[in-house]
């Protein structure tokens, strides 16, 4: 059995996921850098350091997920932390198009169903598929943690408020996929509470990453802060919560 705690971060070859991997290694973890493209994952793992291992993982591909779980089982025997970070914001946004411009093309009245399905395939169904595959490994740990990287734009409470600044970009694609992810977080937390596995959702804030064409206002170090905190929760920590680094967020 591997001595160090083991973490898997999906979508960890760049952005917030890469920073989460770096931070968890700094806390003594062996980190599996999940990446659809193995070559990019290997390059990212080199950045993280000797305690990082690249792992080919496409969250929309059941065969890839199963192979990743089997490799972890054979090489490490368990999983202490799962960070479901992999996400896409769209499939059709043109280079240089602002978030606001894209939002106008993805209203409930005009959005392509193929676009919605593609975003949800990664952001919702991918999270469920990976979590299901990794649960046997998480159950082998003494106090496993699952962190779902969500977004405040998925908050129904906020979007129901006419004064909410980002209300205009709420739509069936990315934003609603994060609403669904929040619901899944609660469902997972309810089921797993008797096992001691804690499941929480983290909002990294508007972080400068490829997801938003690097238009965000926060650094990846700031964006990774809350997911890492939740990954390191002590035994008495909460489960079934939604928060950012300023505190709890409304569902």
Residue ranges and their predicted role:
Residues 9-10, 84-85, 145-151, 198-203:
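Structural signature of the Rossmann-like NAD(P)-dependent dehydrogenase/reductase core
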Residues 83, 130-134, 138, 184-185, ...:
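Hydrophobic positions on the long internal alpha-helix
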Residues 88-120, 139-194:
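Catalytic loop of short-chain dehydrogenase/reductase
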Residues 179, 194, 201-202, 209, ...:
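C-terminal helical subdomain
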Residues 38, 56-70:
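The beta1-alpha1 cofactor-binding region of Rossmann-like NAD(H)/NADP(H)-dependent oxidoreductases
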Residues 1-32:
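Canonical Rossmann dinucleotide-binding motif of NAD(H)/NADP(H)-dependent dehydrogenases/reductases
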Residues 27-43:
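Conserved glycine-rich Rossmann-like NAD(P)H-binding loop of the short-chain dehydrogenase/reductase
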């Amino acid at each position: 059995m591997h001595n160090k705690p083991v973490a898997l971060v999906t979508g960890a070859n760049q952005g917030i996921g890469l920073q989460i991997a770096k931070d968890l290694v700094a806390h003594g973890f062996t980190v599996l850098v999940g990446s659809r493209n193995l070559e990019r994952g290997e390059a990212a793992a080199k950045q993280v350091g000797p305690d990082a291992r690249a792992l080919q993982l496409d969250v929309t591909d059941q065969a890839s997920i199963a192979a990743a779980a089997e490799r972890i089982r054979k090489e490490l025997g368990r999983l202490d932390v799962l960070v479901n970070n992999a996400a896409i914001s769209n499939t059709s946004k043109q280079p240089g198009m602002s978030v606001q411009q894209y939002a106008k093309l993805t209203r409930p009245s005009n959005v392509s169903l193929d676009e919605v399905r593609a975003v949800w395939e990664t952001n919702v169904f991918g999270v469920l598929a990976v979590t299901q595959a990794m649960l046997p490994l998480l159950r082998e740990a003494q106090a496993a943690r699952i962190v779902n990287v969500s977004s405040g734009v998925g908050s129904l409470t906020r979007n129901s408020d006419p004064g909410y600044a980002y209300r205009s970009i709420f739509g069936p694609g990315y934003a609603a996929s994060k609403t669904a992810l929040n619901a899944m977080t609660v469902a997972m937390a309810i089921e797993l509470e008797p096992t001691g596995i804690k499941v929480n959702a983290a909002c990294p804030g508007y972080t400068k990453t490829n997801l938003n064409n690097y238009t965000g206002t926060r650094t990846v170090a700031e964006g990774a802060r809350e997911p890492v905190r939740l990954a390191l929760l002590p035994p008495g920590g909460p489960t079934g919560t939604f928060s950012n680094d300023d505190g709890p967020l409304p569902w």
